[in-house]
Amino acid sequence: MDTTSRTRPDDRRGRPTAAAFFDVEGTLLAAPDLAAATGPLGRLWHPPVLAALHGHAALGHLVVLVARAGATELAPITRDLAPDAVLCSRPEAPMIGQGKGYAARALLRECGILAARCYAYADEAADLPLLAEVGHPVVVGDDPVLLRHARRGNWRRLPAPSAERK
């Protein structure tokens, strides 16, 4: 799949048995659009989501960034975080909506990881297909559509980025 890129060598012993998918815009970063983000990345990280990413990495989970942005725009983020994989937009295939769910499913199949053992973190209704692909969805913020799903499915929640970080 050419929307996936590996960003670090697999130096773990054995294969990962779980994955954690992190929507970038508005979830991992407080900025809803990377093109409009200015200043150092450190100010833009959403601390609870960044902590979750580091926690999953420490557990040996496959860490995957999922973004509407393209690979060039994501380069500073991938350099800082060194995820295992990146699912991002290409000119002919934007990474939005159902595309995020399809890409996540394809990556899990390729890696032989059961979706029931996986996590996804996202902030808006358009990310519902990504959240629906995993056994442990986490809603970030207060999108009303996602909150309804979270209440029905007993999904975890994390707070939205604070206004002064945006």
Enumerate the predicted regions with their spans:
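C-terminal cap/substrate-recognition subdomain and adjoining C-terminal extension
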Residues: 2-22, 41-166
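Basic, amphipathic juxtamembrane/active-site segments
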Residues: 32-38
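Hydrophobic "anchor" residues
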Residues: 27-29
